[in-house]
Amino acid sequence: MKRVFLVGYMGAGKTTVGKELAKLAGLSFIDLDYYIEGRYHKAVSQIFAERGEEAFREIERNMLHEVAEFEDVLISTGGGAPCFFDNMEFMNASGTTVYLKVSVEELAKRLELCKHTRPVLKGRSGEELRAFIAESLEKRNPFYTKASITFDAEKMLTESDVHDISNALMKIL
């Protein structure tokens, strides 16, 4: 029985690497945000807007506890999931946690391309986006760094890079 939790900031590649790594490891893949959306029949951004962050974080915690009961699974968490309640400690006690670490500069490049699909980033670009990421990451890093494994996911430009990162993680897990 194996459980792996991927943590890291939005844009770090948790879903992209997670799918590939799960395939290589013979594990089921669950993206926690998509799991929540499937259960609530609403986008995470809509749940956030309608119920507020506190209610969303409670839903997220409950769904995290639910999927952590599954066996032979790789779970990609939302960027904020490790930072609320005792979620990080819970994940560490339930399986192997892997922090996909990416620099502020690289995250800003990646997120600039998809800022229109991420409500918290709308209207931010350039230096404002970079400053927002830096501030958020500084608050979240104390949680992320509690992961069992920290992995540098800075260079993930091509499908081949994703495959290489997944293969490297397979050797660690």
Swiss-Prot record:
Biological processes per GO annotation? amino acid biosynthetic process; aromatic amino acid family biosynthetic process; chorismate biosynthetic process
Query: Which pathway, metabolic or otherwise, does it act in?
Result: Metabolic intermediate biosynthesis; chorismate biosynthesis; chorismate from D-erythrose 4-phosphate and phosphoenolpyruvate: step 5/7
What enzyme category does the UniProt record give? Answer: transferase
Name the EC number(s).
2.7.1.71
Which is a Pfam family this sequence falls into? SKI
Q: Which GO terms describe its molecular function?
A: ATP binding; magnesium ion binding; shikimate kinase activity
Relay the cofactor remark from the entry. Answer: Binds 1 Mg(2+) ion per subunit.
Q: Which UniProt keywords apply?
A: Amino-acid biosynthesis, Aromatic amino acid biosynthesis, ATP-binding, Cytoplasm, Kinase, Magnesium, Metal-binding, Nucleotide-binding, Transferase
Cellular component terms per the entry's GO annotation: cytosol
| InterPro entries with a match to the protein in the record | P-loop_NTPase (IPR027417), Shikimate/glucono_kinase (IPR031322), Shikimate_kinase/TSH1 (IPR000623)
Residues annotated for Mg(2+) binding in this entry: T15
Needed cofactors: Mg(2+)
Q: What is catalyzed by this enzyme?
A: shikimate + ATP = 3-phosphoshikimate + ADP + H(+)
Residue positions binding ATP: G11, A12, G13, K14, T15, T16, R118
Location(s) in or outside the cell: Cytoplasm
Q: Which domain of life is it from?
A: Bacteria
Where on this chain does substrate bind? D33, R57, G79, R140
What the protein does?
Catalyzes the specific phosphorylation of the 3-hydroxyl group of shikimic acid using ATP as a cosubstrate.
Q: Fill in the subunit field for this protein.
A: Monomer.
Family membership, please give it: Belongs to the shikimate kinase family.
Name of the protein: Shikimate kinase
Q: Which organism is it from?
A: Parabacteroides distasonis (strain ATCC 8503 / DSM 20701 / CIP 104284 / JCM 5825 / NCTC 11152)
UniProt lists the gene as: aroK
